[in-house]
C-alpha cells in the first residue's frame, strides 16, 4: 500500500461517494467511525461491536438479538434507500429505486478485517475504548490527514501514521464540555497539520 496513488484510492469498486468518504473507505476509517457511531447510537460497549468486511456491499448492517436471531438491512450499494427509510421511519415510502435481485449476487462473502494492513480501524477502536475526547481527536486528525493526501502532501500510508501520532501527542479530556470539544478539535487539527509539514 506504500505506493497507492490518489487515483487508485479514489476508485471504489461498489460505491459512488465523494473524495473524502472514498479515502475513508480505502483506509477503513469509515468503518472505524461507524463503530464509534454504533457505540453511541445503541449504547454499546466496544466488545459488543464487530466489523465484518463484505466485498459485495449488499448487507449494510445487521443486528443480532439476545435470542441469536438476526435482522439485516440489505440492498444495492446505494445509500438513497437507507436514508429514505431513516427519514420516513417507521413508515415505508414507495420509491422507484432499482430493486435488488438475489440472482445477480449468487454468493455473499464475509471476511475479518485486516487491522494490521488497515490500522485506522484499530485506531478507531482504541479511541472508542479510551473514550473521553479521543474519538474527537481521531476524527479531527483524520479529516486533516485525508485532505493532505488528496492535496498530494502525504502518501497513503502516512494518513494512519499522522492520526496515530496526533492521538499520542494529544492529552485526553475525560468528560469534555461542548466548548472543550471545539478546542480539542482545533488543537488536534493544528497538531496534525504540524506533523504533516
Predicted segments with their positions:
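Catalytic, metal-anchored helix/loop core of enzyme active sites in primary metabolism
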Residues: 1-197
Amino acid at each position: 500500500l506504500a505506493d497507492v496513488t490518489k487515483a487508485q484510492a479514489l476508485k471504489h469498486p461498489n460505491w459512488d461517494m465523494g473524495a473524502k468518504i472514498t479515502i475513508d473507505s480505502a483506509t477503513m476509517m469509515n468503518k472505524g467511525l461507524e463503530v464509534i457511531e454504533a457505540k453511541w447510537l445503541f449504547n454499546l460497549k466496544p466488545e459488543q461491536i464487530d466489523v465484518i468486511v463484505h466485498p459485495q456491499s449488499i448487507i449494510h448492517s445487521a443486528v443480532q438479538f439476545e435470542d441469536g436471531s438476526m435482522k439485516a438491512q440489505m440492498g444495492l450499494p446505494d445509500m438513497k434507500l437507507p436514508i429514505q427509510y431513516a427519514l420516513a421511519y417507521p413508515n415505508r415510502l414507495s420509491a422507484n429505486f432499482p430493486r435488488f435481485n438475489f440472482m445477480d449476487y449468487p454468493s455473499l462473502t464475509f471476511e475479518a478485517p485486516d487491522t494490521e494492513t488497515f490500522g485506522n480501524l484499530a485506531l478507531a477502536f482504541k479511541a472508542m475504548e479510551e473514550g473521553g475526547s479521543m474519538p474527537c481527536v481521531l476524527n479531527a486528525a483524520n479529516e486533516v490527514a485525508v485532505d493532505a493526501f488528496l492535496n498530494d502532501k502525504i502518501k497513503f500510508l502516512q494518513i494512519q501514521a499522522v492520526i496515530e501520532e496526533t492521538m499520542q501527542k494529544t492529552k485526553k479530556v475525560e468528560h469534555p464540555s461542548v466548548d472543550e470539544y471545539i478546542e480539542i478539535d482545533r488543537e488536534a487539527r493544528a497538531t496534525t497539520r504540524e506533523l504533516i509539514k
